Amino acid sequence: MNLFGTLRAPRELLFGAGQRHALGSIAATLGRRALIVTDTRLAADADLRALVDQLEAAKVTVLVDSSTLPDVPVESAIASAKNAREYRPDLVIGIGGGSCLDMAKSVALLLSHGGRPQDYYGENAVPGPVLPLIAIPTTAGTGSEVTPVAVLSDAERSLKVGISSAHLIPMVSICDPELTLSCPAGLTAIAGADALTHAIEAFTAIRRDPVPGIAQQRVFIGKNALSDHFALSAIGLLWQGLEAACKDGADQAAREKVMLGATLAGLAFGVAGTAAAHAIQYPVGAVTHTAHGLGVACLMPYVMTWNAPAIRPELAQIADAAGLDGPDDVIPALAALFARIGIPASLRDLGLTDDRIDWVAEQSSGISRLIQNNPRPLNPQEMRNLVAAAHGGDRACLI
């Protein structure tokens, strides 16, 4: 096998305690009129006020848009961009969790190219660069600070939708673990489990033939040497730090591991992509109205059990990264870790009713970009069996 890898990343990535204090000097190199995109809770936070003061001290004018809503409804992104046009920002700064960062990406896109988010759904539909983006995450999970993806919710489709383009990767990302110290245990668990799922799905994704041009034709190309490097590092960090961060939010060493793990997982899946756990979560989330991280983490042990015959070498490497004895220990240990931090053990526990199993399976099978990235194929009946097993809490029937 020829060694092949590709990486898409911010032009500048800062990680470490206190690095948020570099915002003013960085922003001043990108423009003089900054639009901050955040939510109402963070807009009233002292940390955000301090960031605004930094920008103003650097002679950067600031407009704060605190209209971000969970899961970024399409209409909210349209309204935010409309309201910002008269201000004419030079750059957009997203501050907050994954929804705030995805909202910032969407607003920068609409301000740059017009139209509606619907015009850009799918891969590579963004025609060119967007306004310079700075991403400052305050949770450790989605990895949006380094990925080419913005996820929104579309009421007309009753599902989350994605805009995927390298043009959406922030120009600068500032990952300061101190901003996560106040994150509640429940949110820490959900976000961190999402990050661990990103890393595992990126590491176990299908490996495609690296024909020249594949990284230009597709946003998500499957696993490769570079994505594997970041994914394995992320798995090790998250396995070490996640439970500790949930138990003691003031444990700065654990917070650092979780945030760095989430960022590295973003670098991994930003090129490798995710797979079946994400495909199934989208319809599950639509009908149960549960958090994305809860759904993908709940599903991960079942998806890995199905995939196990195709990913034996990867399971051995995950075992090494996680400090486990061998590949057979990985899936039970992952399920136990998730149980200890409060992840539901089955889709039934998540609120999915029996009568929606067939619908979820049908919808999941239709998300071809994710199913085609899965290391073991899933036909419609196999998908139905997988969803039913995850609903009933029965991994054994997938072996």
Where are these regions (language model features)?
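C-terminal charged capping/lid subdomain of soluble metabolic enzymes
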Residues: 315, 319, 323-399
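Short alpha-helical scaffolding segments that buttress acidic/His motifs in well-ordered protein cores
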Residues: 196-200, 258-266, 280, 300, ...
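ATP/NTP phosphate-donor binding region
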Residues: 1-91, 347
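A glycine/threonine-rich phosphate-anchoring loop and its flanking beta-alpha core
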Residues: 112-213, 218-219, 317
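N-terminal small/polar loop signature for handling phosphorylated ligands or for N-terminal nucleophile
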Residues: 47-115, 119, 124-125, 243-255
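Active-site segments that bind and position negatively charged phosphate/pyrophosphate groups
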Residues: 208-333
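Short glycine/serine/threonine-rich phosphate/pyrophosphate-binding segments
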Residues: 20-23, 44-47, 74-77, 99-105, ...
